[in-house]
Amino acid sequence: MAKVPRNFKLLEELEKGEKGLGESSCSYGLTNADDITLSDWNATILGPAHSVHENRIYSLKIHCDANYPDAPPIVTFVSRINLPGVDGETGKVNPHKIDCLRHWKREYSMETVLLDLKKEMASSSNRKLPQPPEGSTFF
């Protein structure tokens, strides 16, 4: 099977994110519309229902370096969150602690990562963890 070039993959993701074609509880788009490298993205996750995250909107930054999609993106929460696998000081997501990042496959996408993080928020061991005040940020 032919390998889809990085920019084609990212342009597909940009179109999907801009048109809202994916899961409605997650969104993503370029940080700067003039970014011809398609490297820096903003994203949001709506907190899952029946958890301490319900009715919260979490902001994240995603960086796709030159190795994406062969390597996973670098994901950082802007909104403060108490979640295993997220550094409590910086908001950086530890790629060894989140399933889809740890077992990254080229066909995964930024949406895959956002949905996996949402799944972690809703898991029985995490859905009741005390959270920082709503609206607080890492930086």
From Swiss-Prot:
Boundaries of every UBC core domain copy: 5-139
Classification via Pfam families: UQ_con (PF00179)
Record-linked InterPro entries: UBQ-conjugat_E2_core, UBQ-conjugating_enzyme/RWD
Gene Ontology biological process terms, A to Z: postreplication repair; protein K63-linked ubiquitination
Any GO molecular function: ubiquitin conjugating enzyme activity
CDD domains documented for this protein: UEV_UBE2V
Keyword annotations of the record: Ligase, Ubl conjugation pathway
One GO cellular component term: nucleus
Family of this protein: Belongs to the ubiquitin-conjugating enzyme family.
Record text on subunit structure and interactions: Heterodimer with ubc13.
Function: Has a role in the DNA error-free postreplication repair (PRR) pathway. Lacks catalytic activity by itself. The ubc13/spm2 heterodimer catalyzes the synthesis of non-canonical poly-ubiquitin chains that are linked through 'Lys-63'.
This protein's name: Ubiquitin-conjugating enzyme spm2
